């Protein structure tokens, strides 16, 4: 499609721009409307440039000029620019599908290389007169309108402010500057160039908002585009510097605020870390949310029967994670705490105008609890039903008494019937508690009188009696008091105790102290019928739902001094049956101690070495024996017949066949040598014992018997010369000679020279044996057979190794010396050393006392914390009930008032009707 040429008369007479804008870009070249307005200089320059371009690039139809193709080696001539462009794209560029794609421009003196066909086809427009978008300032033409728009920015003053070395000319035309430099907020319909105006109707799509041409356009005043010079004016620079200074000051102020916030956060983090490091039990001083969650978790576990009111290690961790609740400011002090009455107050709240005021001083001002001063009290959780409140009260009272009991066992729970859900709750025991003996004066924290003085009497789960009355017949039996409840009551919100017992048929109250040792297993099943007041049992039980919850039924005790758990079962098994005196019903308290699992007893951990009571005997196989024969050979040596091993190796020996049977027969024919014959005493070589019939079994002596004692051996040079000196040899000790003859080779050498032994003549020690006689080398089997010939006889005391004195002439003295026990043998005796009676070193008494004081102080704090929560929850409950009562009363009064007003209106209306009638 070819664009129509412009008529000459229209190109010479235009004198204004059209305000119409084409709906789409690019826009076709259309003639512009003739206007009566005078022509402007910028329009004249644009027209001149356009005329030059048209004259140079476009041939006129009248002259019939053509467009030659200047591609290298091409002589094609086109009649129009479109034909030339199609020729370049089809013939010279080609396509990849036709296998003639060329991405290098072959136009005259060009040589541009592209990577895609679209790029080179777009580049070919440069060589053809297909640029219908000229610049109104410099006359340069562009093939796309966005290229022209980008080019027009170089003719603005803002461009020269940013680019000092720019040589592009500027224009003073206000319309051009407003069209190019105006911000998007005040954008108007942009006027077109003389050759790009259109007759098409105005489109709303042309009002698209564009970003500013320069980031500093907003710093300049409106309409500031009248300067014809390239450099900005001083007023513009001053305005720009002022704006930059203001922005820099605002940025610096913002950065300063950020740095201050970072410093503050760092200080807060350091303070929080310091508080965490100073905490003794790991409780977070700033973790108020975590502490509230900890108490709510405890309350939830109590409702779900997941925890027991036992002051154990888990409960200690739970209590350490709590802080006192928010209470009124007049909570009474605890006089029974002795020296721990220096308290620290907490923030309070207003309320309870008709109740006795309470005081929040719970913890003493000690170093471990100093961080509580920086903590705000926790909010009191809301308990919705009376059953939950009764369960909470019974749990906290039982836990508080257990925590207050310093070194006593855990205070067991008892089932109570106070409140609507008390059939499976906890209740406090009577006044006969062990706290008065061991807790050091904290026993008054949870008794009935103390709770009644705080206004808690008659609350669900709290016993209403003021004290237990002791039976005159049995001092350990405690019965419920029939006295009336205290004066502090709560109206008719809660039924009486007797009515509640008759309605729920709950279990009776049982004393928790008297029968604690007789019932080691908690939570035994029991049945109750009739009136619960007529019971005489002394057992103490826990709720039945806790009997098998934790996998064992043994009582779990916590020792305050060592923080260890003591699990044990009592050896006493009882079946207690108590009969009611009123209706003859039976309250059976069965005992199932025999069903409990026995706990394995472990030895106490000590630093002493272990005592191995059971000795382990192992068979030692002789050297050179086969593995299959070691057991039998060991039994033969020790004269122990092992029938099991005989049967075990019977099959193996049968497989060995003839060789094994021959070896066994040869061993049976070999005579056995007693061991005691090898250990010869001094008397063995005396003439009196020479003819005892065992000369062939005696080992030869080291020196001949005729050598007198006390003589020295010959010198070494005589031995080296081989001479036979006639010196005398000193007789050695008999035990020494016997000890040297116990080796295997000596035992077998005794059979080589029996004649020498009989005659008493041997080769002197100084003489050299004949070289012609070879020395016999015994094999391993012979050594084994020789060792097996040894027989172990009865044990005999070892002889003394002291040599015979020269002046001892009598045989009796020699016998006395022989009968003396050897001191070295006594030292090697295997008799056990009696154990030492010295006790192990004990721990310092001062350390134990300090530890006891620390544990006692922790117990006191926890007991006070439990009491504070007990009081806070009950007062919150009472306050809520009183508010509900007051609201109900107000509603009733309002209803009565409304009813009275309605009655008055009806009466007036009736009277008016009567008067009218």
UniProtKB/Swiss-Prot annotation:
GO cellular component terms given for this protein: cytoplasm; nucleus
Annotated coiled-coil positions are 873-914
What keywords sit in the KW lines? Activator, Coiled coil, Cytoplasm, DNA-binding, Metal-binding, Nucleus, Repeat, Repressor, Transcription, Transcription regulation, Zinc, Zinc-finger
| Pfam family name, one | zf-C2H2
Chain positions of motif YPX[LI] motif: 494-497
**Molecular functions (GO terms):** DNA binding; zinc ion binding
Q: Does the record's keyword annotation contain Cytoplasm?
A: yes
Spell out the protein name for this chain.
pH-response transcription factor pacC/RIM101
């Amino acid at each position: 499609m070819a664009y129509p040429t412009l008529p000459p008369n229209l190109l010479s007479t235009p004198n204004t721009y059209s305000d119409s804008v084409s709906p789409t870009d690019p826009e076709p070249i259309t003639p512009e409307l003739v206007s009566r307005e005078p022509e402007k200089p910028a329009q004249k320059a644009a027209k001149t440039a356009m005329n030059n371009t048209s004259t140079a690039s476009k041939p006129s139809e009248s002259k019939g000029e053509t467009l030659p193709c200047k591609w290298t080696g091409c002589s094609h001539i086109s009649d129009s620019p479109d034909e030339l462009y199609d020729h370049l794209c089809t013939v010279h560029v080609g396509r990849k599908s036709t296998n003639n794609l060329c991405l290098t421009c072959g136009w005259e003196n060009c040589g541009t290389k592209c990577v895609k066909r679209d790029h080179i086809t777009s580049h070919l427009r440069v060589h053809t007169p297909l640029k219908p978008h000229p610049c109104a300032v410099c006359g340069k033409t562009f093939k796309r309108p966005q290229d022209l728009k980008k080019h027009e920015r170089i003719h603005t003053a803002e461009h020269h402010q940013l680019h000092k070395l720019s040589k592009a000319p500027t224009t003073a035309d206000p319309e051009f500057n407003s069209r190019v430099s105006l911000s998007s907020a005040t954008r108007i319909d942009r006027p077109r160039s003389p050759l790009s105006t259109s007759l098409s109707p105005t489109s709303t799509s042309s009002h698209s908002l564009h970003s500013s041409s320069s980031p500093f356009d907003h710093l300049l005043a409106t309409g500031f585009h009248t300067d014809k010079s390239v450099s900005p004016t001083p007023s513009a620079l001053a305005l720009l510097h002022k704006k930059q200074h203001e922005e820099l000051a605002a940025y610096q102020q913002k950065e300063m605020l950020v740095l201050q916030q970072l410093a503050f956060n760092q200080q807060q983090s350091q303070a929080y870390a310091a508080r965490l490091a100073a905490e003794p039990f790991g409780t977070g001083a700033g973790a108020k949310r975590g502490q509230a969650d900890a108490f709510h978790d405890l309350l939830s576990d109590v409702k779900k029967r997941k925890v027991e009111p036992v002051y154990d290690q888990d409960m200690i961790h739970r209590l350490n994670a709590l802080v006192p609740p928010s209470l009124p400011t007049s909570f009474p002090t605890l006089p029974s705490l002795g020296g721990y009455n220096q308290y620290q107050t907490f923030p309070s709240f207003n309320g309870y105008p008709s109740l006795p005021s309470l005081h929040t001083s719970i913890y003493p001002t000690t170093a471990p609890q100093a961080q509580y001063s920086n903590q705000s009290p926790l909010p009191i959780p809301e308990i919705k039903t009376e059953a939950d409140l009764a369960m909470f009260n019974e749990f906290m009272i039982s836990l508080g008494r257990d925590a207050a009991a310093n070194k006593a066992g855990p205070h067991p729970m008892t089932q109570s019937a106070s409140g609507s859900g008390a059939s499976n709750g906890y209740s406090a025991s009577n006044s006969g508690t062990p706290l008065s003996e061991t807790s050091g004066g904290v026993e008054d924290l949870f008794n009935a009188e103390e709770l009644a003085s705080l206004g808690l009497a008659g609350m669900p789960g709290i016993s209403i009696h003021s004290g237990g009355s002791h039976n005159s017949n049995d001092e350990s039996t405690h019965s419920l008091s029939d006295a009336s409840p205290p004066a502090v009551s709560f109206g008719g919100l809660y039924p009486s105790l007797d009515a509640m017992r008759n309605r729920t048929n709950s279990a009776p109250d049982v004393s928790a102290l008297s029968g604690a040792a007789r019932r080691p297993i908690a939570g035994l099943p029991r049945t109750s019928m009739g009136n619960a007041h007529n019971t005489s049992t002394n057992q103490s039980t826990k709720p039945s739902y806790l009997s098998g919850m934790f996998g064992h039924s043994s009582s779990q005790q916590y020792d305050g001094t060592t923080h260890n758990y003591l699990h044990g079962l009592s050896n006493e098994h009882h079946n207690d049956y108590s009969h009611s005196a009123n209706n003859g019903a039976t309250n059976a308290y069965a005992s199932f101690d025999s069903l409990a699992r026995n706990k394995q007893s472990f030895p106490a951990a000590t630093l002493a070495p272990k005592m191995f009571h059971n000795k382990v005997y192992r068979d030692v196989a002789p050297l050179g024996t086969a593995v299959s024969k070691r057991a039998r050979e060991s039994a033969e040596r020790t004269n122990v017949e092992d029938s099991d091993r005989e049967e075990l190796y019977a099959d193996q020996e049968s497989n060995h066949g003839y060789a094994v049977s021959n070896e066994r027969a040869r061993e049976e024919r070999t005579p056995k040598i007693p061991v005691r014959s090898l250990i010869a005493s001094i008397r063995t070589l005396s003439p009196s014992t020479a003819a005892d019939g065992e000369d062939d079994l005696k080992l030869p002596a080291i020196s001949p018997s005729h050598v007198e004692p006390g003589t020295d051996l010959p010198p070494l040079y005589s031995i080296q010369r081989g001479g036979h000196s006639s010196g005398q040899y000193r007789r050695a000790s008999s035990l020494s000679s016997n000890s040297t003859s116990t080796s295997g080779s000596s035992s077998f050498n005794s059979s080589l020279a029996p004649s020498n032994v009989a005659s008493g003549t041997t080769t002197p020690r100084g003489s050299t044996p004949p070289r012609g006689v070879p020395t016999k080398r015994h094999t391993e089997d012979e050594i084994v057979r020789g060792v097996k010939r040894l027989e172990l006889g009865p044990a005999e005391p070892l002889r003394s190794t002291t040599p015979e004195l020269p002046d001892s002439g009598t045989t009796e003295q020699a016998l006395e010396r022989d009968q003396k026990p050897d001191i070295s043998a006594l030292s090697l005796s295997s008799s056990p050393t009696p154990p030492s009676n010295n006790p192990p070193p004990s721990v310092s008494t001062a350390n134990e006392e300090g530890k006891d004081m620390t544990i006692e102080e922790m117990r006191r704090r926890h007991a006070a914390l439990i009491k504070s929560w007990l009081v806070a929850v009950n007062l919150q409950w009472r306050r809520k009930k009183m508010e509900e009562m007051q609201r109900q009363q107000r509603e009733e009064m309002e209803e009565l008032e409304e009813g009275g007003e309605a009655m008055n209106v009806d009466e007036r209306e009736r009277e008016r009707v009567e008067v009218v009638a």
